Amino acid sequence: MYEQQQHFMDLQSDSGFGDDSSWLAGDDDLRLSPHQSAAGTNSGNENLDRRLLKDLVEMVPLIEHYMEHKERSSFKRRGSMIYTKMPSKESLSRRGRNASQTVPGRKKRDQEGNDDVMNNSREDDENAKALAGAEKEEMSRLREQVNDLQTKLSEKEEVLKSMEMSKNQVNEIQEKLEATNRLVAEKDMLIKSMQLQLSDTKIKLADKQAALEKTQWEAKTTGTRAIKLQEQLDAVEGDISTFTRVFETLAKTDSKKPDRDYDAVPYEFDHLPYLDDVDETDLRKMEEARLAYVAAVNTAKEREDEESLVMAAQARAYLQSLAFTY
């Protein structure tokens, strides 16, 4: 391939490729000099050479473009195209004069060169067709790869969008979960506070219940005590009535004599010998003890307490001690 490109460059150098005034640049009005027209004896061969050169010149940019942009495994080395400047008209005139002097040798060389150019052109056509086919295949393969990549990219974008939506949903769920946890924590604190208040209320209720039971017990005890006091009071009143009768009997020193005599036999009372020995001092003490006992009993009735009852009991015992002496 590199040799073919070098051959193309040689042809371009010989035919004046690269100048704006060259016939290869598309100037159809440019005519050869008289010396050059005299040197070209075979016009058909010249037309053939021009067509081949034109085709080759049109193929060179395609090959160069392909070699610059499409690296193939079979063409790992790249050759660079070197464009030479077209000779001036004066140099072309000099070359025409020199060519007119050597026409027979030039014809022979031109004939051989034309054969080589035709062979090379056929090879170049085949190579160009092969390169064009390979380029088409490469372009098709690249298009397929690009389409596949675009499809994969679209799928990736869809996956990313789906992941983004899922992430947003997860974030929303996480926020809702955190809000729910906060509400649950607040409810737990409220429940604990209510439980503490309920415990305090239960304790207070138990205290009140105990106080009520104590009050009921005290009331019951007080009622029982009142009954006992009433019984004791009744007994004391009975004793007082007994002692009163005794004192009234003792207070009578002599009996009342009748105004006149009766024939009936008087009733004989039993004699109480222990009353004869009682003097006035003992009777006065017993009377004072009786009055003190009566006062103690009255006080106990008014107050209804243990102290009054104790005093009444002491007064009764003192009175009994005086009475039972005789």
Swiss-Prot record:
Residues 1-15, 34-46 have a biased composition (Polar residues). Expressed in seedlings, roots, flowers and developing ovules. Residues 1-46, 71-132 are annotated as: Disordered. Keywords: Coiled coil, Cytoplasm, Cytoskeleton, Plant defense, RNA-binding. Transmembrane segments: none annotated. Residues 132-183 form a coiled coil. It is found in: Cytoplasm, Cytoskeleton. GO terms for biological process: cortical microtubule organization; defense response to virus; negative regulation of protein transport; plasmodesmata-mediated intercellular transport; positive regulation of defense response to virus by host; regulation of cytoskeleton organization; response to water deprivation; stomatal complex patterning. One of its GO terms (cellular component) is cytoplasm. Prevents homeodomain proteins (e.g. STM) association to plasmodesmata and, consequently, cell-to-cell transport. Binds to RNA. Alters STM RNA binding capacity. Regulates cytoskeleton (e.g. actin) organization that determinates cell shape. Regulates stomata patterning and drought tolerance. Involved in restricting tobamovirus (e.g. oilseed rape mosaic virus) infectivity, probably by interfering with cell-to-cell virus movement. This is Protein MICROTUBULE BINDING PROTEIN 2C. It comes from Arabidopsis thaliana. The lineage of its organism: Eukaryota, Viridiplantae, Streptophyta, Embryophyta, Tracheophyta. The gene is MBP2C.
